[in-house]
Amino acid sequence: MFSPDQENHPSKAPVKYGELIVLGYNGSLPNGDRGRRKSRFALFKRPKANGVKPSTVHIACTPQAAKAISNKDQHSISYTLSRAQTVVVEYTHDSNTDMFQIGRSTESPIDFVVTDTVPGSQSNSDTQSVQSTISRFACRIICERSPPFTARIYAAGFDSSKNIFLGEKAAKWKTSDGQMDGLTTNGVLVMHPRNGFTEDSKPGIWREISVCGNVFSLRETRSAQQRGKMVEIETNQLQDGSLIDLCGATLLWRTAEGLSHTPTVKHLEALRQEINAARPQCPVGFNTLAFPSMKRKDVVDEKQPWVYLNCGHVHGYHNWGNKEERDGKDRECPMCRSVGPYVPLWLGCEAGFYVDAGPPTHAFSPCGHVCSEKTTAYWSQIPLPHGTHTFHAACPFCAHQLAGEQGYIRLIFQGPLD
């Protein structure tokens, strides 16, 4: 550890609170990471604290008075109760915390710009036509500047005027201690895994987080007026592996400590080379198969392994058993004659999604993303929010809904014959 005189040494690496990783991207956005819009965002201790905490509450404001308070050069949250009455809560500087804001807006208060994830999209243009359901100022994360650097999540973010407005139609209420609280239109949902983010992890229960960071059971639908029941024994404190859903994109929170136990990209590359060094062969063409470099994630290579998803037999690409009368991608496996989808295999390159450092022996179905057995087993159990009131398991590397009984398959490679 550092000795006290090193604490303020300028060359000391900045403290990392954790990282947010967007589900559905395999290491980077399709057209590359740019500025505040990327697939992974690291939260570091700021040179100067920018956190805020609630202070003065103004009750029974007229709209004009509320506007005057909101126009002051400090943060505030306005709760519109009726056309004649607004409650404004002023927020004051908190020197003990750092604030990070996430949303769809590209305005300067947003630290991490997140847009809707389209399953399996290969370019940002695929996402442009979609009507976004992510809030412009979706949520904020407040991190304590001193150990253990606790991170807490709150619904809604402050806009360029340092305000959060909850209009007449937003769900809002007065709490038992006389404070105000509310929910955003489509809500911010959080799920904390049981047993942390490890090979023993199990899914937790999805909850909704309020503007003040309280925890509620889910509403009947995403934007219903009626809030769920308050869950007093749970908190808005993020833990390693917590999932944050913004209604259009889901983020994985990894703590700095958790990431230190996660396989590195270098480790995943070594596993790729190890598989290729074993020279797996296509049982039909006897040609050697090889997983392409991790930098090439969307163009099928001629040596690329393909798999029959019903049985797991790995082949090179060939036309054997391709009968025209069959629908779509269904093919008959030459090894065992089972009929099912036949897809190329892709290595999962986003190391933050792995729950262990095991070899890439299993693939998600139907997309063909390959990773460790424990990682496929974990993600296949996680019900991810989809639309306004449904949930389904999806591949973390591309966001495709999983298919089949398990949602993943064990790969059966044929070794070289020599």
From Swiss-Prot:
GO terms for biological process: DNA repair; negative regulation of necroptotic process; negative regulation of T cell activation; negative regulation of T cell proliferation; negative regulation of TORC1 signaling; positive regulation of B cell activation; positive regulation of B cell proliferation; positive regulation of canonical NF-kappaB signal transduction. Pfam families: Pellino_FHA, Pellino_RING. Phosphorylation by IRAK1 and IRAK4 enhances its E3 ligase activity. Phosphorylated by ATM in response to DNA damage, promoting localization to DNA double-strand breaks (DSBs) and ability to mediate 'Lys-63'-linked ubiquitination of NBN. Its EC number is 2.3.2.27. It comes from the Eukaryota. GO terms for cellular component: nucleus; site of double-strand break. The modification Phosphoserine is found at S121. Residues 311-399 are annotated as: Ring-like domain. E3 ubiquitin ligase catalyzing the covalent attachment of ubiquitin moieties onto substrate proteins. Involved in the TLR and IL-1 signaling pathways via interaction with the complex containing IRAK kinases and TRAF6. Acts as a positive regulator of inflammatory response in microglia through activation of NF-kappa-B and MAP kinase. Mediates 'Lys-63'-linked polyubiquitination of IRAK1 allowing subsequent NF-kappa-B activation. Conjugates 'Lys-63'-linked ubiquitin chains to the adapter protein ASC/PYCARD, which in turn is crucial for NLRP3 inflammasome activation. This is E3 ubiquitin-protein ligase pellino homolog 1.
